[in-house]
Amino acid sequence: MTKDFLLRLTEEHYGAGAFHVYGRLLEEQRLVRGGPLLPMWHCTAALRRAFVEDSVLVLGCTNDSLLAHLLGATPVNPLPPHYHCPNCHRLIFDAHADDGWDLPDLTCPECGAPMAAAGHNLRSRSLIGESVVSLQVPQERFAPVCAWLRDYWAQRDCQTDTEPYSDAEVMGLRLTLPEGVQGIFEVRVLYPTDRLDPLPSDVPPLHTAYRRIKGMGLRLASDAWTGTERDAVERGRMAFEDVLTFREDVYDLLRQHTPPKQRRENGLPWAISEDVRKGKYAAQGMPKLIENYLCKQLRVPAHYIESMKHIRYLPKKGDCVGRMLFEGEK
């Protein structure tokens, strides 16, 4: 994956001079270089084309990658909210929007054509160390998709092995690339939306796209909307948009409370957000060291800390967006 390839990809989708886009691709190249993700994303894009794009739900770090999006491996655009003119490629970022889907209609100031709005502000940080592509498909497509994946890699002289946990509803396919690098495709049977928990009746109206994404987060999460959150919203201590409904909410909260001079990534905010996502503090309790860091050093409001202590699971934001696209709930 050369810089020339990334430049061509940028110009193909966003035109010449889209330096923000090119810079994001360079960052992702640095994070995935030498790993299996790039060939796995090419495979995922081919799989989506072979089985009709809207019958394959892509989850995990793939949704956080602009490179994966431009290759066709995921419909989720991880860039910050922005307008893009499909005619002349004028690109305008909006730092004040919560989500690209909420941007109002805009006519291109250069050529007068209607501009497209996109962008969900997902970070490439999740690509570090990843080697798993997660997919969900309807039950009737599960066996054909698994067979297609084995055949795809066999044609490319790659060894594949089925993981021991595989059964009638999940397949873990470990592949070994010719360079010796390994990755895993995890394919699961997709449960329809009606199998998800319904939204609590006391959740505020979801009148914006961003609120609907937050609502999907609550449906996928466990114990993210309890008395602590309801009380904080009702008393005006925080807006519904600030409720912790996916992993990125926790990370953004910690970064916002970190003094500017200390914001150089040290891994701790991301580690805490992952622990909250997996329900570690709900199961094992929050270590005093972490609680003091949040309370005394970052001065995170108490209601957020209480939320982190009882959340049993948070989805990734990209998975919420992907699920909405899959279900046609944009």
Where are these regions (language model features)?
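Alpha-helical scaffold/interaction cores of sigma-54-like transcription cofactors
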Residues: 1-330
